[in-house]
Amino acid sequence: MFNEITKSVTWNGQVLELSTGKIARQADGAVTVKMGNSVLLCTAVVANKAKEGIGFLPLTINYREMAYAAGKIPGGFFKHEGKASDREVLVSRLIDRPIRPLFHPAFVNETHVTCSVLSYDPETPVDILAIIGASAALSLSPAPYLEIVAASKVGLINGEFVLNPTLALLKTSQLDLVVAGTSDSVMMVESEAHLLSEEQMLEAVKFGFESFQPVIKIIKELAEEAKKPKLEMQALYPASLKKEIEKLFVKEIEQAFAIKSKQERSTNLDLIPEKVLTHFVSDIENKKYSNYQIESALKAIESDILRNEILEKNRRIDGRSTTDIRQIACEIGLLPSAHGSALFTRGETQSLVSTTFGTSLDEQIVDSLEGEYKERFMLNYIFPPYSVNEAMPMKAPSRREVGHGKLAWRAINPILPNKVQFPYSIRVVAETTESNGSSSMATVCGSSLALMYAGVPIKAPVAGIAMGLVKEGKNFAVLSDILGDEDYFGDMDFKVAGTSEGITALQMDIKISGVDFKIMKVALEQARLGRLHILEQMNKVISKPNNELSKNAPSTTTIKIDKDKIRDIIGPGGKIIKEICETSGAKIDISDDGTVSVYASDRDKLKVALDKIKAIVVEPEIGEIFNGTVVKVLDSGAFINYVGNKDGFVHISEVSGERIETVSSVLKQGDIVKVKLIGFDNKGKAKLTIKNADKDKSSNNTKPKTNVNNTNKDNSEPEQRRDSSKKRAWNEDNNAETAEVITERKYFN
């Protein structure tokens, strides 16, 4: 019934298996990928008819993580996989980027690739398996897929490169890098790094590139046995058509490209296609040429003009040389109500960035196959249509916005303080207000400025730069700080972010058949020089974090309590913690390890909440004086609430220095009286006295004294505490960063 074909290779100590012919047999290409306990189904479907006139490859990649793959039921009301998560979007883009450039340039058939995780093993990198499976499925399909791609993940642990590190290993790694390519060249790089040098990054890419070559071999073997006939492709346009357009319109195109302003240049270039189509109207009517062929030939001429100017004259369309950076302007604190803000402008690209602090309750909860976890740092990239003067409605975040936001997140995350050093959650919103190339790197620069102005103690300022490439044969030019047109007509988009000491993020996308390591080395060094120049301009405005947080930022403190006191703060059904939050206006977050974080809009509210918590968790010392409230009067005495939610008993003999007939003749419910703690009974209940308490010189407080040895009312040896854990919950000897206020200088204003 099944004609299954399987190929396998031992890769990094695990067996990687690719098979076809058993599942999803009606798809044009279907491959099951297995490694460890991970199983993915990758399919490729190609439409029979071309979608002419669209000017781009209609390729859609969908990566899906099925909940059952990890033995889970989806959350939410419907208990069903819904819209793609950010993780699924990011992996979909990761698959798309190395694959898209490898189709025949004239191929415009609708193509859909789906990669579904059917079984999940945290010891294997499913995103890497998805890239491999998608490439294999396309190689089996009729799509004119010209090269075979594979990928690998690289970590750096204890100075050694690690192939396909597990999630546990990645937590200790200085590098998280994905590299994809063909047998000859690198096609895509995506990474987050902890201040690594250009040399280390290049060596990591080489390591990953060499590591996936055995995988390419088994994909080729599978394709040789199971592939379907490829679609026959024609040239995009006749060569004679291009020559005719050049002869008639090249001068006008060159004049338009000579305009330095993007908007004016675009306006003039947009007028040319209509003129060209009008000239060839009879040929279109006679079906000698199609609109799509004419427009494609015109785009090729525009590309030739831009590329020749760069390669032959070292001159770009805005007049810069290949290494020049556009003019930079930085401004901070322009949004008075934001916790931090900055405006970063580089040429005609501009990003308005704001920073907001929140509590641990505001952290992003992420539900993934690995399990549920929280993200303390959030970065949202917004690309509104007005930034490129387009009249379009605002929509939900696109895949591009999610991807650009994650790249900027990767660039900033390595230089952020940890939660002990800075207890807030952080949200950065970067709105691209103008765009002419490299808006994601403008986001990185603006985010660094806004964070420093907000007072976040980042390790160092971060800047980003986008590099381009124009390559013809062996001749090539690497471009610093590319424009939108240079990105569109160029061969590479290579984004590098980092500090003056090293790289924090790197992303490379190639539009040709690949680049070699010589080009990458030149691009990395040129990017380093450009990054240093940008940092120099940024440092003129702000070079280190402000010492004070914004007056609008919330106040916070973190204390450490005994774990057995957690339930006392929470109370039955959360009654106590709710009451504290409602009366103080603060927010409280309690961790399982006994860390209590308190947040409030101002210091007064913070103090109220903190005092209430202290009153609950402290262990009062014998001999302390308190202002107590009478809660119940009995014939034998009275119950007094003397601190927090703690009640003690005053025997009738301890109510007054004089003999009294009844307790009710002296005390009434609700009375405020001074009481002194004189000991505990055999059940651990507090014993109090009112006699002479108001004459004691000790003042009322809710913080216990240190090492106070008091005697009981009989002047005998000091009573033992109720149990061996009666040491104070409020431990003054705790580490300064985790006990009281974490650096009061910064977090209180």
UniProtKB/Swiss-Prot annotation:
Reactions that this protein is recorded to catalyse: RNA(n+1) + phosphate = RNA(n) + a ribonucleoside 5'-diphosphate
Biased composition (Low complexity): 699-713
Domain of life: Bacteria
Matching SUPFAM superfamilies: Eukaryotic type KH-domain (KH-domain type I), Nucleic acid-binding proteins, Polynucleotide phosphorylase/guanosine pentaphosphate synthase (PNPase/GPSI), domain 3, Ribonuclease PH domain 2-like, Ribosomal protein S5 domain 2-like
Pfam families documented for this protein: KH_1, PNPase, RNase_PH, RNase_PH_C, S1
InterPro entries: ExoRNase_PH_dom1 (IPR001247), ExoRNase_PH_dom2 (IPR015847), ExoRNase_PH_dom2_sf (IPR036345), KH_dom (IPR004087), KH_dom_type_1 (IPR004088), KH_dom_type_1_sf (IPR036612), NA-bd_OB-fold (IPR012340), PNPase (IPR012162)
Biological process per Gene Ontology, one example term: RNA processing
Domain annotation S1 motif: ranges: 623-691
Residues at which Mg(2+) binds: D487, D493
UniProt key word RNA-binding: yes
Keyword Lipid metabolism: no
Sequence ranges of Basic and acidic residues compositional bias: 714-723
Keywords linked to the UniProt accession: Cytoplasm, Magnesium, Metal-binding, Nucleotidyltransferase, RNA-binding, Transferase
Family of this protein: Belongs to the polyribonucleotide nucleotidyltransferase family.
PANTHER family per the UniProt record, alphabetical: POLYRIBONUCLEOTIDE NUCLEOTIDYLTRANSFERASE, POLYRIBONUCLEOTIDE NUCLEOTIDYLTRANSFERASE 1, MITOCHONDRIAL
Protein name stated in the entry: Polyribonucleotide nucleotidyltransferase
Name of the gene this protein is made from: pnp
